[in-house]
């Protein structure tokens, strides 16, 4: 029993001696760190020293609040967030595509140029020529459908019949000499008839033979009167 008591006493003495050595080392370490970091703050335990007491208003002049410290390097300890490429592509695809007004106008003008090409349209109707500038090709089909419902239009080909249209003015030019010739003949016939019917010398000629015929026959009547008187 006595041996056990002595063993426990020696173990307790060793523990006390080791604790004392640890405390002495800690106090020495704090003394060394007091000049650089100061106390427990240099150990990295996150402890800050107590703020200093504000000086009296009359001793150093105006009252100044204690300086505040800001930890600007706190974001370096946070782990970096990595973005997967698949999620970035899907997010870009989900965004709505907005076109500028200039792009929309260029697309519309290109579609109009491809679908509706304006050309010159010439129509011959009623001896007149009508010309339309920049007439869209899509409206030509509508115009042919409207014209095809008429009577003087061939429904199979969609073109107007040439028989119903009057002759153009330039086709009557070769007929002008013939018309002049006919009018000249009519004028000569009228003048010839007038000369034969109303000429004064023809009237005198016709009157002279009638007088001569009457004079030749007068003696015949005188002879008859003489024979009648002799018989009486």
Swiss-Prot record:
Composition bias type Polar residues, residue spans: 156-165
Pfam families hit by this protein: Jas_motif, tify
Natural source organism: Oryza sativa subsp. japonica
Motif Jas: where in chain: 177-202
Domain Tify: 114-149
Domain notes: The jas domain (177-202) is required for interaction with COI1.
InterPro entries: CCT_CS, TIFY/JAZ, Tify_dom
PROSITE patterns: TIFY
Subcellular location field: Nucleus; Cytoplasm, Cytosol
Region (Disordered): 54-73, 152-177
Subunit structure: Interacts with BHLH148. Interacts with COI1B in a coronatine-dependent manner. Coronatine is an analog of jasmonoyl isoleucine (JA-Ile). Interacts with TIFY5/JAZ2, TIFY6B/JAZ4, TIFY9/JAZ5, TIFY11A, TIFY11D/JAZ12, TIFY11G/JAZ15 and NINJA1.
Inducing or repressing factors: By jasmonate, and cold, drought and salt stresses. Down-regulated by abscisic acid (ABA). Induced by wounding. Induced by blue light.
Other facts: Plants over-expressing a truncated form of TIFY10C/JAZ8 display a jasmonate-insensitive phenotype and have altered expression of jasmonate-responsive genes.
Name of this chain's protein: Protein TIFY 10c
Function: Repressor of jasmonate (JA) responses. Acts as a repressor of JA-induced resistance to the bacterial blight pathogen Xanthomonas oryzae pv. oryzae (Xoo). Regulates JA-induced accumulation of linalool at the transcriptional level of linalool synthase gene LIS. Linalool is important for resistance to bacterial blight pathogen Xoo.
Post-translational modification: Ubiquitinated. Increase in jasmonoyl isoleucine (JA-Ile) levels mediates its degradation via COI1B-mediated proteasome pathway.
Keyword vocabulary terms for this entry: Cytoplasm, Jasmonic acid signaling pathway, Nucleus, Plant defense, Transcription, Transcription regulation, Ubl conjugation
GO biological process, one term: response to wounding
């Amino acid at each position: 029993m006595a041996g056990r008591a002595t063993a426990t006493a020696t173990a307790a003495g060793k523990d006390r001696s080791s604790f004392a050595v640890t405390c002495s080392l800690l106090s020495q370490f704090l003394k060394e760190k007091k000049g650089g970091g100061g106390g427990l703050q240099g150990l990295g335990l996150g402890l800050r020293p107590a703020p200093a007491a504000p000086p009296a208003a009359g001793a150093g002049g105006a009252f100044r609040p204690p300086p505040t410290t800001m930890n600007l390097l706190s974001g370096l300890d946070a782990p970096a967030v990595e973005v997967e490429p698949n999620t970035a592509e899907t997010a870009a695809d989900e965004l709505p595509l907005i076109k500028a007004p200039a792009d929309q106008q260029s697309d519309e003008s290109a579609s109009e140029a491809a679908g509706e090409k304006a050309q010159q349209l010439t129509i011959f109707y009623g001896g007149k020529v009508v010309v339309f500038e920049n007439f869209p090709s899509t409206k030509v089909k509508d115009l042919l459908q409207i014209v095809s419902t008429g009577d003087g239009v061939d429904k199979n080909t969609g073109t107007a019949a040439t028989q119903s249209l009057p002759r153009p003015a330039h086709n009557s030019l070769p007929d002008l000499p013939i018309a002049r010739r006919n009018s000249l003949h009519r004028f000569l016939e009228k003048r010839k008839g007038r000369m034969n019917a109303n000429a004064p010398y023809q009237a005198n000629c016709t009157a002279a033979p009638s007088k001569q015929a009457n004079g030749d026959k007068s003696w015949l009547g005188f002879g008859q009167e003489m024979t009648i008187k002799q018989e009486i």
